[in-house]
Amino acid sequence: MLIKSIISLNLISSSNNSNISKDDKLKIISYDLNKNSNTSPKYVCIFTRPLYNC
């Protein structure tokens, strides 16, 4: 779970998409942390509207 959250954080923090605010990033991270252990960064990516090109 922790590893997946770290991966998600890396995806978010390394993004150069200016449409993502810091608040959005925090919400995305919180969402990932609150999900079950089967959550993957890919799922978070899909969940966050068209913020990422996954």
UniProtKB/Swiss-Prot annotation:
Source organism superkingdom: Eukaryota
Protein name: Putative uncharacterized protein DDB_G0286477
Species annotation: Dictyostelium discoideum (Social amoeba)
